């Protein structure tokens, strides 16, 4: 079981029980009138810390990316077509995506984006570990993080097929992801005090 990242059978059984609960929930909802007119959203709030090395590069275990890896499922067989996607997204993208699915006008005053709009420059998610001071960005190829309390930064592959970079390319990626992580961090801090509803 440890090969698949589970530390115990109890942990594995908790995952299996979650799947069972989703099934029972949907089976019950299918019997209700609202089912054909509802978008169900399932998302985890955190992943599992553990050895993910069987499936993912070292960063998933050593930099604890597995704790950030959660499922996201939009389910509405009468309203949306099935898709299987694997790009890097964030929990902050959920509300703008739902609003976009509803095809109603809305003002997005968050950092999130509509995942289905096709208007994406870059697939990325911000990470933060408050206690240790690490902020970072994971995208479809790399995980970059830096410590805001000390001069320390890391750039590691986030996928097995991550690109091989020259030193100049690596420096360019580091610089870009450093600027992006700082921009998101500072924007989120600003929004905390200034992004008030009317």
Predicted regions mapped to residue ranges:
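Solvent-exposed soluble domains appended to multi-pass membrane proteins
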Residues: 1-198
